[in-house]
Amino acid sequence: VPLPDAGIVTHIHFDHLDGLGNAYRLFDHLPVYAADETDPATDESVAGTVARKYDYLSRVEVRPRTPLEPFEICGLEATLVPVEHPPLVCYGLAIEDPETGAKLSLSGDTAYAVPDRSRAVLADPDLFLADAIVPASLCEHHPLGGAHHDPDGVPRTFGTKHMTREGALDLADDLSATETRLVHSAHFYPASEAFEEPIAVDGETYDL
C-alpha cells in the first residue's frame, strides 16, 4: 500500500493516534490535520494533543482545522464533523472531489446519535464507511446494554460509544449512501456473520 500524502486524526484514543510515533521511520514530512476545538474532558483540542504528544517528531506537522468548515487536503475538500463518542470529542469526515463531485463519508467512531448538522455534511455519499463494532444481538453482553433503539427495539448503539451493525446500516439509510462498507468491526462477530456483506475486509479498494 503506498504511503499517504497526509493524515487526519479524528480523536485521541490510542488506536487512532499512537501509530504516529513510527512516522519518522517512513516519512520525510507528514502533514496531519485535526480539529482545533477544545475538549472539555482534556482541556485541549485533538490537534493540541497530537502536537504535544509528538512535538519531538519534526517530520509530523500538525495542521489544526475548525470542525464543520471545509479545508483543502491533497486536492480534495474535507470537512471534520462532530460525532458522539463519549467522553471525548470525536469527528467523522466528509471528503469530496471538487472536479468530479465524488464523495466519501466516514462516520468515525460514534454512537448512532450523530448530530443533525454533522449528518447534513455527511449526507449523500457515493461511499460511506460506517463504524459497526458488533451485531445488535451482542448488546446484552455490554454492562450498559444498548441504546438508540429502532422502532422494533433493536439497539443501534453498543453501550455508548459505537454503532451496532444495525445502527450503522440505519445511519447509512438516513444519509442516503449509495454504497456502504462496515468498518471498525470487533472480533466478536459470530463466525457465520463475520464476512457477510457489507462488512469490509482488509485490502478492499474503491473507485469513486
State where each predicted segment sits:
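Binuclear metal-dependent hydrolase catalytic cores
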Residues: 1-107, 111-120, 178, 191-208
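Cap/insert and terminal regions of metallo-dependent hydrolase folds
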Residues: 114-207
